[in-house]
Amino acid sequence: MHLPSSSSLYSSPTKSLFAMFLKARALSVTTQNPPDLFSLLHHSPNAKHLRHLHAHLLRTFLYSNVVLSSKLVLAYSKLNHLFPTSLSVFWHMPYRNIFSWNIIIGEFSRSGFASKSIDLFLRMWRESCVRPDDFTLPLILRACSASREAKSGDLIHVLCLKLGFSSSLFVSSALVIMYVDMGKLLHARKLFDDMPVRDSVLYTAMFGGYVQQGEAMLGLAMFREMGYSGFALDSVVMVSLLMACGQLGALKHGKSVHGWCIRRCSCLGLNLGNAITDMYVKCSILDYAHTVFVNMSRRDVISWSSLILGYGLDGDVVMSFKLFDEMLKEGIEPNAVTFLGVLSACAHGGLVEKSWLYFRLMQEYNIVPELKHYASVADCMSRAGLLEEAEKFLEDMPVKPDEAVMGAVLSGCKVYGNVEVGERVARELIQLKPRKASYYVTLAGLYSAAGRFDEAESLRQWMKEKQISKVPGCSSI
């Protein structure tokens, strides 16, 4: 039988094995445990050759060999035939053990079908006599992390305890990482503290989890504990440490971490470069951020967006727009953060038409505006004194405006003394946040500025009766 050349797909030993297999098949030679089949399946032959192997297994009844059949499932998955081919092979296996279940559950999890992976696990638990081992549970916990299915994660946790896997380092580590990924840091910390042995992966996960949730101080405490335990620091830890420094505005510490990275790393990778740039942006040291950005060997949308947002929030309209245009010229598509940067720049510059241009451009990139994008546009219109238009913009929003969006319009009303719009927006905000004194104070100020002193005094009296008071400011003098 003539087969197309596969020199680009196979090493010489594998090609020889397949030639031997074809010759043996032609002579109807069969064994119960042919090593060539294991080797061919392991090396993931192309789809055509794999179908030959599949047919041979069926014809010679070697399909009943659970290891061979499981390897066949894995081989199809490696060729991106996970669904439906791998799954079909799996369900047609005459016998399935934990090895075969682990393969199908793991492959669905690794291929991005987390929910399907969870469904398979639950089916194994309910419909078969097979019970999970300490390889199955980390696989399924990883799937729960990816799918953010908290209910499934809690259920698997209960099963882990019920089956006696609480002492397994593999399972406990997977549980900690799952809860970190879901943002349930109290659960993760309790498990972490109860573990007799902890490795650098766990410390890094906890540290990163705290920083991702904005708990920079708790993250730094975990970092110190990690250092006291003698674990080596790597680039993953440094990324989280830089994020913590950025959140706290700890420029001095951020510079120290930057120096450590330069001394230890011959070339800053993309993630480290992005983290250093973002740290300087959050500390409002944009010259340093730009220098790091320019010297990066590779930049992605995160690199560009971080700097564009920094200049936008700083009010540097020219630089924000310039970087946006350069990014598009390099063929990098903007994301939601990129547009937030240029919209913030528009708001600072009072560029209403430009803000509408960028806001509409989001649709061309299939980016659904978030509330913060609406807030930036509303802020831009309000700063320009277009308060009736801004109010209409709020009314036409496809989602209910939040405090930031309405607050931007109310601030504009305060600047321009627009009592009519300000009164309507303030009442919406008071309904949303009835205990927030600043909205009452702003509305009372609008009444007073318009000469409506009785209404202003009535509102202040009502605040006293409801015990709504503004938190007094502090002075260091």
Swiss-Prot record:
Protein's UniProt keywords contain Transcription: no
Top-level taxon of origin? Eukaryota
Q: Where is this region: Type E motif?
A: 405-477
Q: List, alphabetically, the Gene3D superfamilies matched.
A: Tetratricopeptide repeat domain (1.25.40.10)
**Could you state a single Gene Ontology molecular function term?**
RNA binding
- By its UniProt entry, which Pfam families does this protein fall under? E_motif, PPR, PPR_2
GO-annotated biological processes: RNA modification
- UniProt cross-references to InterPro entries, sorted A to Z: E_motif, Pentatricopeptide_rpt, PPR_At4g14850-like_plant, TPR-like_helical_dom_sf
Per UniProt, the keywords (alphabetical) are: Repeat
PPR repeat feature ranges: 65-96, 97-131, 133-167, 168-198, 199-233, 234-264, 269-299, 300-334, 335-369, 370-400
> Does the keyword Cytoplasm feature in the UniProt annotation?
no
Query: Coiled coil located at which positions?
Result: none
Sequence similarity: Belongs to the PPR family. PCMP-E subfamily.
Name of this chain's protein: Pentatricopeptide repeat-containing protein At4g14170
Instruction: Look up and give the organism this protein is from.
Output: Arabidopsis thaliana (Mouse-ear cress)
